[in-house]
Amino acid sequence: MLEAAELECERGARTLFRAVSFVLAPGELLRVAGANGSGKTSLLRILCGLARPSAGEVRWKAEPIARLKEDYSRELVYIGHAPAVKDDLTPRENLAISCILAGQAASAEALAEALERLRVPELPVRKLSQGQRRRAALARLLVSEAPLWLLDEPFATLDAQGISLLNDLLEKQVDGGGAVVYTTHQEAGIRSTRVVDLGAGA
């Protein structure tokens, strides 16, 4: 499904990580571990195609993602560490725009149902708490049928209820044959299939 082959990432004169390799199969949940500065976010950006590795290659279904481009983008959901939601829009408007940009269509009913399930109030995002903003971003997972999820610190700012909801989503994704790569600084109850440890960092 997803293959990382001898990935290396450099920032200036510093090497964040090197020789990172794994093959992620359907139904697997992979946690990326490592201290701050070890390159966890950089690895996820490389895996989703937003950044290029200094060396190595990412493959999706045996094809280099550089060749697949938009076709690969439609097969994944990437949610970064900072919730990518616009303050002046409502959660539903943000969700609709993110689906359009990703080329992943969703009905108005599906958008409303996703936000209701995650208990996100329909207010301008600037009025939401950090945890509610995170839930608004995570609603993408409910309206997408993408087989691959790449999640950077998805549990950050969530309360106990939010963590439980996200755990349920992750379990449903892998039980349905999807795959997940995520980073986290906290034990959140979900048990990963495997761990890639990037080490101590800077």
Residues covered by each model-derived region:
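Helix-to-loop junction immediately C-terminal to a conserved catalytic motif
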Residues: 48
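Hydrophobic anchor residue at the start of the ABC signature
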Residues: 138, 177
